[in-house]
Amino acid sequence: MRLNLVIVFLLLVCCVFTCLSAFAQLPPPKKDPLIPTQATQGSTGCSTTEASSCAQAAAKILPIVMGASPLEENLRRLTDEVGGRVTGTPEMAKAVEWGVGAFRAAGVDVHAERYTLPVTWSEGDTRLEMLGPVKFPVRLKAEGWSPATPAGGIEANVVDVGFGNEDDFAKAGGVVKGAILLVHSDIGSTWADLFNEYLRPPMIIDRAVREGAAAILWMGARERLLLYRHTNSLAGEIDKIPQAMAAREDAMRLARTIAAYPGKVRVRFHMPNKIGGPIEQENVVGEIRGYEKPDEIVILGAHLDSWELGTGALDNGCNAALVIEAARAIKATGLLPRRTIRFVLFSGEEQGTVGSFEYVKAHRTELDKIRAMITFDAGIGRVTGYSLGGRRDIAAGVREVLKPLESWGANNHTYDASFGTDNFDFLLEGVPTLVANQEEANYLPNYHAASDTMDKVDIRELKLHTALAALTAWGIADRAEPLGKRLTRAELEVLVKETGLGQQLKVLGYWNAWQSGKRGRKP
């Protein structure tokens, strides 16, 4: 069914606005939060009926985290020695070993939990050969979960379809059939631009398949020939059509050549991606058991996997190391929380949050007792607060927990609900979720790129985030009352509608799974 252009445009605007709110630029960065004071000792604690356990915990956690620690060495070993780690590869297996070993060294109980990854994917030798009338090199990388080209590659004309909207396809006409399509992009510089890189492709891919195109070349949104990789199939499945990301300057040169020689630019496209599976994969799970309500759980998580062009330092090695360091710090205080704190390193996030989806399925009987799921997944930009997944009912509790760090400027929360990281399936199951809202810092230029390496990580900033994460998990776990309840399906239906999450689910292809109960709390 052909979508009206106006509806498509409005849908994208709604989705981008919803996603942008998750990373809204709140107050400008504060002065150094550790000067002149480390924590507000006189703060109200985790409950109005008890002493300031959060302030006491903060006073113990801060010197442990900010002092000498294994954080930097743990991150170095993960990024420099293990390197990029695509789920389903030997490097991912090494990353799991790294996580288990680091938790054990921190004195935290740990185990790995298996699940079945239906499909594995890795890139082969991706090449684009210009056959004429002009020849020049085009640097490109396969898009994640793209199918391989046939043996011998695809030989076809390249057709410029602009930004890939309905009008662009209509102007191109019948020449789209059997062609390789070049799709333009604007330069990306904001969180909204990044989310748009995920929101645009599904409809463009559907148009390309419907019109019989052979493959798609996406123009990179970053300058200076920087190569990076996204996935346009967000459900852990091989995509519908071969796709690659071309370096921006090369793609623009290709567009100019097509304009100069209409209908004559011909190429041979080789992309022998390796597709396998199913295969057993693992999430890494550490735990500090609660002393009073051990069956109630607060999860602090981050994804361990990455793409392999760089070494996955900003996305998301630094936050995998953060989770382990937060566990070490809490353990080292000698304090026990009322509830169990579970520390989870998820795999399969880059393939469409597969690992966290499988975790939720495996722990479905526990979901009523999971009091919060906290996750970090945006590099080392200063944390301004949390995205609370549409849950205004938990805001006061979160502010109370973070009151000991009032001067840090990290208690400004948003109420958006969006797809994008491992909170997703917990949110759809009605569990309270907290996703760290962070300033952009150097995340966007290096996201999924060859430049995502450890030298981009500000270790001191990472330590501050670790202290914040540890106190958040501790405070929620040690509250006298739960932070918030698990929402019913009816309540989730309202949340999905009011936050605009439903629009995202439709654009990204999750709507039917949500409606049927395959994804999220069952009707």
Locate each region found by the language model.
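Soluble metallo-hydrolase cores and metallopeptidase-like ectodomains found primarily
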Residues: 55-57, 139-173, 233-313, 325-328, ...
